[in-house]
Amino acid sequence: MITSIATTTAGAFEVKSLGFIPYPSQPKRIFFMAQVIFRILAIAFAVASISAMVTSDQNVIVFGMDTAARYSYSSAFRFLVGANAVVCGFSVLSLIFVCLMSRRSEAILEKNYYLFLHDMVMMVMMVSGCSAATAIGYVGRYGEKEITWTAVCDFVGKFCNQALVSIVLAYLALFCYVALTTLAAHKLNHSSSTAAIRQNE
């Protein structure tokens, strides 16, 4: 038994001395791949949502008057674009952070906490942006008869359709961050349990 342990320790020392990083365990590898995939998807959905919204401008003639529909006329749509931009930027930074964390052989509780906090803030921001844009989009498409607000999508169909696509893409980015927050919470809980066990030993 002592010989086996010594051999294992020597082998590990030789691997580290040659500069190789030990191959991560299966759960850690799955967690890393899920983090990378969901962050890349969140970036892609956020960029696509911004593109759909900023290119949704439409000029139409209504009752003989030249009318323009632009996302910048709505504070809710501007907020959604801003939220997508912030989430996209921080997703790139967090992707780099996750890749750097994966190079360490041991989980660090403090860094897992920061990752969880980041993902939760991004999720809340996307919830705010999607909720605001959905409310305005609903009124624009269906109107509000009780207060005599008329639906405008019958006149500016292109604008409304692209705004709808943008909102759907933003929701997909939101779902990515719901998954990331869940993963980060699970990882944080696991790291806390591991740290507590080591402290009691």
Curated annotation (Swiss-Prot):
Domain of life per record: Eukaryota
GO cellular component annotations of the record: plasma membrane
The UniProt entry lists the main location of this chain as: membrane
Localization (cell): Cell membrane
Give the UniProt keywords, A-Z. Cell membrane, Membrane, Transmembrane, Transmembrane helix
- Cytoplasmic side of membrane: 1-29, 100-119, 184-201
What is its membrane topology? Multi-pass membrane protein
Q: Which InterPro entries match?
A: CASP/CASPL, CASP_dom, CASPL
- The transmembrane segments are 30-50, 79-99, 120-140, 163-183
Coiled-coil segments on the chain, per record: none
Extracellular side residue ranges read 51-78, 141-162
Self-association or partners: how does it assemble? Homodimer and heterodimers.
Q: Which family does it belong to?
A: Belongs to the Casparian strip membrane proteins (CASP) family.
Q: What is this protein called?
A: CASP-like protein 1F2
What organism does this protein naturally occur in? Ricinus communis
Q: List the taxonomic lineage.
A: Eukaryota, Viridiplantae, Streptophyta, Embryophyta, Tracheophyta
